Amino acid sequence: CPSMTVRENLSLALNKGKLLNLRKCLRYKRDFLENLLEGVSLDLKKYLDVQVKFLSGGQRQSLSLIMSCLTNPSVLLLDEHTAALDPKTSNEVIELTNKIVREKNITTLMVTHNLKHALHYGDRLIMLHKGEVVLDVKGKEKEQLTVEEILEKFEYAV
């Protein structure tokens, strides 16, 4: 919620699914919440008492990602979650995504038009065109692909 602080948003996310008022949610100690944000490269730790509406796009995306993974979901759906970010921030958010997904072992479906990200992250790459699967690779085959080869396969398929 943009009008709430980072701390308030994290506290609510930690209590997802529980019928608690905000005051009870805020029982989480500052050091606990700071520890949650440890290692997040966009300095979110310094902004615990700042309203979300004052954060940068990358900070908001990082906060959303962290909040969505606090309750250990079985599946995480990401739809172009770095598309509106500058390249540097996009890389920071995608690295945070990779770290969280790997540490928590969360099955993730990531939609992206960034072919480098599509190649580098994840165990399987599925490319669609007009709702049809035109490429489905995993394992060694995926590891050996280049961006240029993906583009060639796409052009051949369409």
Feature-to-residue mapping (PLM):
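Conserved beta-strand-loop-alpha-helix hinge in the C-terminal portion
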Residues: 132-155
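Helix N-cap at the start of a conserved alpha-helix in ABC-type nucleotide-binding domains
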Residues: 87-89
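Q-loop/switch helix immediately C-terminal to the Walker
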Residues: 4-16
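ABC ATPase C-loop
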Residues: 68-69
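H-loop/switch region of ABC-family ATPase nucleotide-binding domains
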Residues: 112-113
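Helical segment within the ABC ATPase nucleotide-binding domain
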Residues: 91-103
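Hydrophobic anchor residue at the start of the ABC signature
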Residues: 65
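Catalytic Walker B motif of ABC-type/P-loop ATPase nucleotide-binding domains
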Residues: 76-79
